[in-house]
C-alpha cells in the first residue's frame, strides 16, 4: 500500500494528494484521525492494518478531511465544528453519527492517550490532539509549513493567532508535531514564525500573490508558511 506509511508500532499515516490521515491502534480499539478527500479506500486500508473496532476523530471538517467519513461511525468532533460540518455534509453522512469532543477530554486507547485541545481560527472548532507521555501533537491544519486556507466561511484570523499563542505557551509539552499538510514531523520552533507571518500579513507587510488555483483570495508567503486569505 504505497499510500500507507508505518511510523512506529501501532501508528500509521495515510497520504493522499497533499493531505494526510492518521491511524493509532490501541489496546482494544483504534482511532482514525480525518479521512482525506475520499479518493483512497481508507476503510479497506484500515481493515488491512488492524482488527480492532475503529472510531473517527475529525481535527476539523473541511472537505479534504471528511471524504470517507461515511464509512466510519461514530464521528467525533468539537461541538463548535458541527455547524461547519452540517453546512457541507459529505454524501452518505448524517449528523446523528456525530459525537462531541470537548477541550480537555482524554481519548484513552491504552498505550495512547490523546488530550483534546481547542484551536479555533482555521475553522470554528478545529482541534489538536496531544499525547503528553509520547510528547507528540497532531496539529490539523493550524500548525504546518504548507498553505493555510484562511478565506471563506468559518475562518477567523484573530482566533487563529490566539490559538497559535496558546500552543506557544504549551510548547514544553511536545517534541514532535504531525500536521495534515506539508512536511512532518515539525517542532515547536515553527509556531512563532507562523504567528509572525499572520501578524505581518494583517499589517500589510506581505505582498499578496495570485493563488495557485482560481480562488477568491491572495497568497501571502512568509518564511515558514503561506496563507490563502
What are these regions (language model features)?
Residues 37-110, 195-204:
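Active-site HxH/HxHxD metal-binding segment of metal-dependent hydrolases
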Residues 38-41, 61-67, 83-84, 124-126, ...:
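Active-site environment of divalent metal-dependent phosphoester hydrolases
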Residues 5-8, 74-125, 131-134, 146, ...:
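Metallo-beta-lactamase
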Residues 2-48, 129-140, 144:
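Conserved beta-strand hairpin/beta-sheet module of binuclear metal-dependent hydrolase folds
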Amino acid at each position: 500500500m504505497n499510500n500507507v506509511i508505518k511510523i512506529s508500532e501501532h501508528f500509521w499515516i495515510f497520504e493522499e494528494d497533499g493531505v494526510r490521515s492518521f491511524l493509532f491502534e490501541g489496546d482494544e480499539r483504534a482511532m482514525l484521525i480525518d479521512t482525506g478527500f475520499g479518493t483512497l479506500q481508507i476503510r479497506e486500508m484500515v481493515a488491512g492494518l488492524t482488527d480492532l473496532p475503529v472510531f473517527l476523530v475529525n481535527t476539523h471538517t473541511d472537505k479534504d478531511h471528511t471524504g470517507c467519513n461515511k464509512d466510519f461511525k461514530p464521528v467525533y468532533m468539537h461541538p463548535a465544528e458541527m455547524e461547519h460540518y452540517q453546512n457541507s455534509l459529505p454524501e452518505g453522512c448524517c449528523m446523528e453519527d456525530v459525537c462531541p469532543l470537548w477541550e480537555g477530554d482524554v481519548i484513552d486507547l491504552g498505550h495512547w492517550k490523546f488530550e483534546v485541545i481547542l484551536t479555533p481560527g482555521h475553522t470554528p472548532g478545529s482541534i489538536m490532539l496531544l499525547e503528553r507521555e509520547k510528547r507528540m501533537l497532531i496539529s490539523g491544519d493550524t500548525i504546518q509549513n504548507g498553505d493555510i486556507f484562511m478565506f471563506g466561511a468559518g475562518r477567523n484570523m484573530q482566533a487563529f493567532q490566539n490559538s497559535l499563542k496558546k500552543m506557544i505557551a504549551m510548547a514544553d509539552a511536545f517534541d514532535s508535531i504531525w500536521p495534515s499538510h506539508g512536511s512532518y514531523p515539525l517542532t515547536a520552533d515553527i509556531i512563532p514564525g507562523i504567528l509572525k507571518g499572520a501578524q505581518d500579513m494583517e499589517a500589510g507587510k506581505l505582498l499578496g500573490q495570485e493563488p495557485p488555483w482560481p480562488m477568491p483570495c491572495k497568497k501571502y508567503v512568509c518564511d515558514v508558511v503561506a496563507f490563502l486569505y
